[in-house]
Amino acid sequence: MSERAKLQKKKKVTEDLLDSLLLLPPWRNFAISQSHQSIIESSSQRLPEKMRIDENEGVSASSKHLVFAYYVTGHGFGHATRVVEVVRHLIAAGHDVHVVTGAPDFVFTSEIQSPRLKIRKVLLDCGAVQADALTVDRLASLEKYVETAVVPRAEILETEVEWLHSIKADFVVSDVVPVACRAAADAGIRSVCVTNFSWDFIYAEYVMAAGYHHRSIVWQIAEDYSHCEFLIRLPGYCPMPAFRDVIDVPLVVRRLHKSRKEVRKELGIAEDVNVVILNFGGQPSGWNLKETSLPTGWLCLVCGASETLELPPNFIKLAKDAYTPDIIAASDCMLGKIGYGTVSEALSYKVPFVFVRRDYFNEEPFLRNMLEFYQCGVEMIRRDLLMGQWTPYLERAVSLKPCYEGGINGGEIAAHILQETAIGRHCASDKLSGARRLRDAIILGYQLQRVPGRDIAIPEWYSRAENELGQSAGSSPTVQANENNSLVESCIDDFDILQGDVQGLSDTCTFLKSLAMLDAIHDSEKSTEKKTVRERKAAGGLFNWEEEIFVARAPGRLDVMGGIADYSGSLVLQMPIREACHVAVQRNLPGKHRLWKHAQARQQAKGQVPTPVLQIVSYGSEISNRAPTFDMDLSDFMDGDEPISYEKARKFFAQDPAQKWAAYVAGTILVLMIELGVRFEDSISLLVSSAVPEGKGVSSSAAVEVASMSAIAAAHGLSIDPRDLAILCQKVENHIVGAPCGVMDQMTSSCGEANKLLAMICQPAEVVGLVEIPNHVRFWGIDSGIRHSVGGADYRSVRVGAYMGRKMIKSMASSILSPSASSANGGNPEELEDEGIDLLEAEASLDYLCNLSPHRYEARYADKLPDIMLGQTFIEEYADHDDPVTVIDQKRSYSVKAPARHPIYENFRVKTFKALLTSATSDEQLTALGGLLYQCHYSYSACGLGSDGTNRLVQLVQGMQHNKSNSEDGTLYGAKITGGGSGGTVCVVGRNSLRSSQQILEIQQRYKAATGYLPLIFEGSSPGAGKFGYLRIRRRISL
């Protein structure tokens, strides 16, 4: 073979290997970085004009000079610092790089001194707007993005296309500016993104809080990303479905300039002194640093401190130009907020990272999981950060043994891939525009867009956490009798059940089994296992196993009929579902309570004798991005001799959004104190384990509240009627959590019975009976995968609109009754008498919209209510809408007619539905029941509480119902969105038959094909908390 032929063959093999990068599976636990490295190393002897990477020399120069345009997001320094590493290698290879950024020049020029680096100070996105170092303002972030990138979009695209042509750019790189990808496509230049997250995923959460009218922002961002050729994905990544192809690389980390010894010598710090670096991204921290914050003998190096900030003697202010990677590597641990830069450097230099959560940033759970997997992370509660209670966290951090051994040359490898692509590799074959390529995607509860046919790449740890909570879509709806019996026997072996009965409930037996395993976890802290879920470790030390434990259970609910009409006084029909929340409670004398180390430090700092402390562990934190534990001194609930107000409690729990969930649990204690005069003298340990998935519209919050209050009441000998307990739990959600829900959720969870519908008139909470579900009728819930929240903007605005409508109706009725108004309008007393003065008087004092009949509404008020009204206009005319749990935003326009009309008609539909359930069995009966569900669904949509996912599910049910091949044996008859709407679960009614279940599974698969999400199916029922009672148990000590 000739020399030329040999070279050509080697070239072809190398090209095939490089091309295979695009086909590699999602990178897990960094193992794949070795595969990438071997491919790259195999190219080191390729043709001279091609690039190669040498272990010592980095990216070698190509004979083809290239011009790169590198766009950097405006969010923080972390993106800019990792871009430096990639740019440094590109410039070393002889290319020009134009960096488009809003970051200060020194971030780049301190590392790269080359005329080939060009910096253009332009900001084309805004990232997340932060109120301070730890708090993201979600609405402000969306508004700022609109102002920065949406309003001037046409001008931006025109300017960027012109600029790209002017610099003769060969290739565009984005980290991770959306519009840059579209600008590159318009300029006819190929582009690639380099990132660990994308802004469509981050903003999808903000849309939920700000309202779905902002949804177009997410769609546009995804469409922009879809124009790039592929994604170079960094470790700790989020799902990013808008990208066509993915190449995974190792960590991109800034190189070290000096050794630990050199840095400490320059700073005058001895080798044996423990050092923590305080690193919050250069943002002002806003708290007072105290000498007592550190353990004795420690020093703290402060990054980004203002010139005027006075520091205690054991704190050292670092120079503005201090090179942070060297300082981190020379420290014993780091204290800061999680971001890609801090996490990657902590892992690379094996420096334990004490982190404080940021609010509302979806990137964080993925980075946090990676940090904790490699034994490199300790979470600090925000309260302890601000109060200076750092010692237990720092001491815990230096006991860790970080074990990350993966690659840290991601910048080098990314530069290699970019150069290879720019000189002609991986040419794009798909010339369709991004908008035509993308399809709907539902990912981790958010509505996004995806490239069809590509794996969405949900991280394995997330799926595992879902399965552990019993929330897997593939989980079996029933437990076989023999399996159930073995579970019962097993839990009886583990515990003496001193009071109560498990009632054959398999989930209760499973919970008791998990309780029995906790003391094993506690005793095996020296376990050789690489990673134990943090919440399990915390739960392992929660209970004293020699003392009694009280267990309560409360199910979620399926909203069959009624929904949001509950706060307007409607009749509702609710079914308790199979999935439930379990809560275990134990009382302890304060002196004998096992306290977590930071709780001990807090009490010692106060210099007080042991006082009652509440400690809570909640399972499922990994999939809901919240802290797994919460603790407080119960004295914090007291103001002198009286309990604090609900308003103060709401502010107390809102201080740290990562721990706001505790309001649902701990709030039950304060309600008992305020409403029943209970005082708590003992410490309380409480474990929450809920299989009712959050954000699905099946009342996960009510199940937690009811189970928590039931268990606490049982442990303290309080006997509370189930109805009264439900009303108390509603106060938790309304007044302490601050969510404007009605009472039907808590009432169903507390008073419901298995396989029956709870019928209740919400005025405010009159249970009118239990309705037997006929044997031939069955209800299912199908989860749309879209997170739902009654605290969201859409639910709240619809409630405000309904109360506005009620106030207007009352005002109109009063006006008609007024003699002066009647004569002014040309009316006469006889006409008034014909209409019915009693009727008008009742409407003038209308307590609930549902007490107004549909025909009366249409005859007198429908054409007089406005479709929309500005909040300020309403307040000027009517003063207030008389709703104790919502506030009118004067600058916002509210829909009025649809939200007011909905409960009036819904109440009529529910009454009809209830009557139909007791009518003769027939297809007409089922058809009528289904028709009422459809009516309800479209009424929700008219109010603005629909969603693409729930609409799609209802359409799939309709298609199944009207499919000719199914018409002879019709099984599904109707479907509707449930609860607060805007996502969540769809309720389906059908014939109780095997064919119906098969059709439900078929809908599940069709939905997955359309959205990439396999929905949960809720079927079956279980008893409410009142019917279950409680268990009083004691651990059996094995001999």
Curated annotation (Swiss-Prot):
Positions annotated to bind ATP: 693-703
Enzyme Commission no: 2.7.1.46
Residues annotated as catalytic: 745 (proton acceptor)
GO molecular function: ATP binding; L-arabinokinase activity
Family matches, as Pfam families: GalKase_gal_bdg (PF10509), GHMP_kinases_N (PF00288)
Enzyme class: transferase
Keyword ATP-binding: yes
Catalytic activity from the UniProt record: L-arabinose + ATP = beta-L-arabinose 1-phosphate + ADP + H(+)
Effect of residue 705 to K: In ara1-1; arabinose sensitivity and loss of kinase activity
Residues the record marks as site: Transition state stabilizer: 557
Keywords per UniProt: ATP-binding, Carbohydrate metabolism, Kinase, Membrane, Nucleotide-binding, Transferase, Transmembrane, Transmembrane helix
Other comments on record: Sup1, a suppressor of the ara1-1 arabinose-sensitive phenotype, contains a second point mutation resulting in a premature stop codon and a complete loss of kinase activity. Therefore, the putative arabinose transport function is independent from the kinase activity.
Record's protein name: L-arabinokinase
